[in-house]
C-alpha cells in the first residue's frame, strides 16, 4: 500500500532524481485537500452502518429471491455475512479515499473477491448493485446533502457548509474506488 508521499518517493527514486516539479505540486495539492479528505472519510464512517444496511435492503428490494429459502441472504447467518462483506468493502473504499491511493483496496479487498464470491455462489450482479447504492450514498454524504427526510434522526452531516465545487474531486475519487469494486465483480 502506497500513500501519495510514498508514491512520490518511489517515483523519484526510480528516476534517480529528487522529488520536484509535478510530484511536488501533487503533494502540495494532496496536503491542501487534507481536511476535506478527512471530512469526507468521516462522513462515510459516521454513516457506514446506515449506508450498508440501506444498500443491502435496496439490493434485496430489487431481487426478493435473495431472502427466499435457498437465497443468498437466507437464513440470518447469510444475511449477516452479506452485511459484513458490504461493511468491509465500504471500509476499504474509505481507506483508499483517506490514502488517496487504491492499492489498499486492490490488495486487501478486491484481490480474489470475484473468484471467492463465484465459488460461494454469491450473485455478483446483486453485490455490484449494493456497491452502486453505497457509491451514490457516499457521494451524497461527501457533498453533505443526503436526504434528511429519508434518513431521519440517524443522519449525521459533516456539520460545515460545503461548496460543491470543492468536493467534486473527492466525490469523483470516491466514485472511482466504488467503480473499481464494481469492475472487480463484473
UniProtKB/Swiss-Prot annotation:
* Classification via InterPro entries: Globin-like_sf (IPR009050), Phycobilisome_asu/bsu (IPR012128), Phycobilisome_asu/bsu_sf (IPR038719)
Q: Which GO terms describe its cellular component?
A: phycobilisome; plasma membrane-derived thylakoid membrane
**What is the recorded membrane topology of this protein?**
Peripheral membrane protein
Post-translational note: Contains three covalently linked bilin chromophores.
Q: Which SUPFAM superfamilies match?
A: Globin-like
**Pfam families given for it?**
Phycobilisome
**Per the record's keyword annotation, is DNA repair included, yes or no?**
no
Residues reported in the UniProt entry to bind (2R,3E)-phycoerythrobilin 2: 82
Ligand binding ((2R,3E)-phycoerythrobilin 3): 167
- Which key words tag this protein in UniProt? Antenna complex, Bile pigment, Chromophore, Electron transport, Membrane, Methylation, Photosynthesis, Phycobilisome, Thylakoid, Transport
Q: Extract one GO BP annotation from the record.
A: photosynthesis
Q: Which residues carry this modification: N4-methylasparagine?
A: 72
Where does this one sit in the cell?
Cellular thylakoid membrane
Binding-site positions, (2R,3E)-phycoerythrobilin 1: 50, 61
The protein's role, per its UniProt record? Light-harvesting photosynthetic bile pigment-protein from the phycobiliprotein complex.
Q: Which family does it belong to?
A: Belongs to the phycobiliprotein family.
Q: Cite the record's note on assembly.
A: Heterodimer of an alpha and a beta chain.
- List the protein's name: C-phycoerythrin beta chain
Q: What is the lineage of its organism?
A: Bacteria, Bacillati, Cyanobacteriota, Cyanophyceae, Oscillatoriophycideae
Amino acid at each position: 500500500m502506497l500513500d501519495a508521499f510514498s508514491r512520490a518517493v518511489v517515483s523519484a527514486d526510480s528516476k534517480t532524481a529528487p522529488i520536484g516539479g509535478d510530484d511536488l505540486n501533487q503533494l502540495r495539492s494532496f496536503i491542501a485537500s487534507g481536511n476535506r479528505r478527512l471530512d469526507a472519510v468521516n462522513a462515510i464512517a459516521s454513516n457506514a452502518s446506515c449506508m450498508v444496511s440501506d444498500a443491502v435492503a435496496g439490493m434485496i428490494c430489487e431481487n426478493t429471491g435473495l431472502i427466499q429459502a435457498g437465497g443468498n441472504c437466507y437464513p440470518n447467518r447469510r444475511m449477516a455475512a452479506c452485511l459484513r462483506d458490504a461493511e468491509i468493502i465500504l471500509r476499504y473504499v474509505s481507506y483508499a479515499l483517506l490514502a488517496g491511493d487504491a492499492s489498499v483496496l486492490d490488495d486487501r479487498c478486491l484481490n480474489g473477491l470475484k473468484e471467492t464470491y463465484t465459488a460461494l455462489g454469491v450473485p455478483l450482479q446483486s453485490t455490484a448493485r449494493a456497491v452502486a447504492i453505497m457509491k451514490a450514498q457516499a457521494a451524497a454524504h461527501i457533498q453533505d446533502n443526503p436526504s434528511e427526510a429519508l434518513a431521519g434522526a440517524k443522519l449525521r452531516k459533516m456539520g460545515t457548509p460545503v461548496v460543491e465545487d470543492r468536493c467534486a474531486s473527492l466525490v469523483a475519487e470516491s466514485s472511482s474506488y466504488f467503480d473499481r469494486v464494481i469492475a472487480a465483480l463484473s
